[in-house]
């Protein structure tokens, strides 16, 4: 791929397939959550459905990652999309012939979350190979911009569709998008093969699994970066709970103002992604930029709810822009550093860590929200994450810097 521009046949196709998948996901996730609450009138039952989406991440990824690392990633991607297509067609049929059944949506969430584990690991191991050498930052900038852009457009569209289109037809529409995505993915030439053609045995699986753990024990820089990202992601999700509660209860604030603040963050992400597509940060500067962003981001989170509303908007815009910058630099560096035959295993191990951190931090947010003022809880969680940034990113510069400066040969 060396010497080519970013928009090769394979990169264009995987980007188009990603767009179709994101549109489908955004089109069905909100309506399903709205439907469950409308039918049950229970926040607890709605939350249980959401929790089912996290359960497969706790262990399944670690168990299947060695197999995915040895396999053709394209087959996994196309196969999982085909399986999801069948699930959506089945849901269209079930919802057409029968009334609402809570257990059906619990099963649907568990099945789609399980399939997503396989899909996500195969995608994260395959996608770096589809970016032309030398275009890594631009490639990750584009992929990192897709979700916020589509989310801005699809959130109101999905809410509108929920009121205008029957549930069976929504499932059929998403199935049609998946069928189109499969057709696009099937035309990608690079298949992500790592297999030697040998028979894969339980003994080799255990050996591959152990190799993943050994790599993480040996590579302190990778371990530090992924551990911090588990902290940061969990912190962001948990503080969002307290921020929503603050906007719902504080005088002079409203849910609409919270939505505008989220839009400011998304706009920052879009502008940052566009800038990174045009301007590349040299590898030698990635670590310094990342250190600054992590400290700045957590300080802004700590101060957010103590600011006047206009400053909150500026805060979220800046964090959106800088957050996308650091995420793109991290993805570029880490995927250049990781051996191709270990990507799924390493990502799976840290997905498990991230899922555990998410559950713990959301519990912490719930406890702090009951015991303290909401903005105090946000400041404490963000302060804890700032300490994690110092301990895991800033201080171990000797082992972290080589990861951030990595380039593909």
Roles of regions detected by a PLM:
Residues 33, 88-95, 158, 162, ...:
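Structural signal for membrane-spanning alpha-helices in multi-pass inner-membrane proteins
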Residues 165-172, 210-270:
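A single, central transmembrane helix in multi-pass transporters
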Residues 31, 40-47, 141, 255-262, ...:
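Small-residue hotspots at the loop-to-helix junctions and early N-terminal turns
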Residues 59-62, 70, 74-76, 80, ...:
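C-terminal transmembrane bundle of multi-pass solute transporters/carriers
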Residues 13-29, 52-68, 72-84, 104-162, ...:
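Substrate-agnostic recognition of the 12-TM MFS/MFS-like secondary transporter fold
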Residues 1-11, 191-226:
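Juxtamembrane intracellular "pre-TM" segments in multi-pass secondary transporters
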Residues 33-38, 91-96, 153-173, 249-251, ...:
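Transmembrane alpha-helix termini and helix-breaking/packing motifs in multi-pass membrane transporters
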Residues 98, 129, 171-200, 394-407:
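Helix-loop junctions on the cytosolic side of multi-pass membrane transporters
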């Amino acid at each position: 791929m060396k010497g080519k521009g970013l928009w090769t046949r394979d990169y264009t196709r995987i980007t188009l397939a990603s767009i179709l998948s994101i549109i489908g996901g955004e089109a069905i996730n909100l309506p399903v959550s709205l439907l469950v609450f409308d039918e049950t009138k229970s926040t607890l039952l709605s939350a249980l459905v959401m929790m089912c989406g996290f359960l497969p991440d706790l262990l399944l990824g670690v168990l299947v990652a060695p197999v995915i690392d040895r396999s053709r990633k394209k087959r996994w991607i196309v196969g999982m999309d085909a399986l999801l297509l069948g699930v959506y067609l089945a849901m269209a049929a079930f919802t057409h012939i029968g009334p609402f059944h809570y257990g059906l949506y619990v099963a649907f969430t568990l099945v789609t979350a399980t399939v997503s584990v396989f899909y996500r690991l195969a995608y994260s191991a395959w996608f770096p190979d589809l970016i032309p050498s030398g275009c890594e930052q631009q490639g990750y900038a584009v992929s990192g911009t897709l979700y916020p852009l589509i989310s801005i457009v699809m959130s109101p569209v999905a809410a509108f569709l929920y009121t205008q289109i029957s549930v069976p037809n929504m499932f059929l529409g998403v199935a049609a998008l998946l069928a189109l995505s499969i057709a696009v993915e099937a035309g990608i030439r690079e298949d992500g093969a790592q297999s030697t053609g040998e028979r894969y045995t339980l003994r080799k699986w255990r050996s591959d699994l152990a190799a993943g753990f050994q790599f993480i024990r040996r590579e302190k820089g990778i371990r530090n970066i992924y551990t911090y990202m588990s902290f940061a992601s969990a912190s962001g999700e948990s503080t969002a709970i307290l921020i929503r509660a603050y906007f719902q209860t504080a005088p002079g604030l409203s849910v609409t103002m919270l939505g505008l603040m989220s839009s400011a963050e998304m706009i920052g992400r879009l502008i940052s992604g566009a800038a990174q597509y045009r301007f590349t940060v040299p590898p030698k500067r990635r670590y310094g930029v990342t250190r600054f962003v992590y400290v700045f981001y957590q300080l802004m989170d700590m101060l957010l709810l103590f600011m006047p509303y206009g400053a909150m908007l500026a805060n979220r815009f800046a964090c959106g822009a800088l957050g996308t910058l650091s995420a793109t630099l991290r993805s570029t560096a880490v995927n250049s550093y990781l051996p191709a035959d270990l990507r799924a295993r390493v990502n799976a191990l840290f997905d498990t860590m991230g899922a555990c951190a998410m559950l713990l931090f959301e519990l912490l947010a719930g406890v702090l929200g009951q015991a303290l003022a909401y903005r105090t809880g946000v400041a404490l969680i963000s302060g804890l994450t700032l300490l994690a940034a110092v301990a895991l990113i800033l201080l171990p510069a000797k082992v972290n810097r080589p990861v951030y400066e990595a380039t593909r040969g």
